[in-house]
Amino acid sequence: MTPTARLLAATLLAALAATSPAQSRKDSVVLGMVLEPAPGLDPTMASAAAIGEVVHLSVLEGLTKIAMDGTVSPLLAESWSVDPDGRVYSFKLKRGVKFHDGEAFDAGDVKFSFERAKAEGSTNKAKKSVFDNISRIETPDPHTVILVLERADGNFLFRMGEATAAILDPKSAAGTATKPIGTGPFRFEDWKKGASITLTKNPDYRNAAAVKMKKVTWRFISDPAAQVSALLAGDIDGMPRFGAPQNLPQFQADKRFTVAIGGTEGKTIVAINNKRKPFDDVRVRRAIAAAVDRKAIVDGALEGYGAPIGSHLVP
């Protein structure tokens, strides 16, 4: 049995977002967040999804960007070409880009970031699947990076747009977990542990005029009842991954709020160690799978906002 076949009682959680009337503050926004990023704010060395939610594309950027429909477009890369074998990627980098500390962005930063991600002892969650597949990194000039892969990867450009492939400055990379410095439209301002993280607009961003918000604050609110109260009081402007689906009708009926329901990668699973008795017997695992009513869990615990997992799914 493969690891993904162990997902016996998995449900795909719906992303429940509610926005409040406090949105009248046009140049700042306060968003609720279920989980505080841990253990730090470096998405290239820690796996928590909450890290990328705060800093990816806001503070830190990569070579490419993934759109809502899954298409890939340039970000720090201006353009690229791929050889016929699908193993050699040549990226032309944008010029005039600077990190928040004033350091210029160039090909050396890309080389450093990817070598760091694939180094022995790296804790980058994409190390094995992405960075170990890069056999050679060439920087023929400051604005060109050539990545040579061991084997062709049709998802490589997509993977370059994930938080794990964010580009860091060698001079500040070591402090990314507590004070991330990137090339993005927002700068890291403050982290009040247990309370909030604040980002402020980067006035030197290459497209600063398009950045309408001067300040973004993430408030950590894990308790569903507290999420409801914060929205109703106008203390927060929005709550992605809203944790009280039973309260959705209340917000949907209130014209002050907009409710958006969508899918996420969140999963609720039963994890089993197949090497331990009695779970080393496939018949036991099949019995557990048959006994779990996935739909009942979705309906009872999530008010129907979820989908039972009926096949293989990555953990």
Task: State where each predicted segment sits.
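Local pocket/hinge segments that shape ligand/substrate recognition
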Residues: 208-210, 238-315
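Bacterial N-terminal signal peptides
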Residues: 9-16
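Short, well-ordered beta-strand elements
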Residues: 26-35, 78, 88-90, 110-113, ...
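Aromatic- and charge-enriched surface segment that lines or borders ligand/interaction sites
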Residues: 78-123, 140, 146, 230, ...
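Short helix-initiation/N-cap motifs at beta->coil->alpha
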Residues: 132, 217-229, 242-246
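Surface-exposed binding/hinge segments that line
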Residues: 23-24, 92, 126-169, 190
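N-terminal lobe/hinge region of extracytoplasmic solute-binding protein
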Residues: 32-84, 115, 181-183
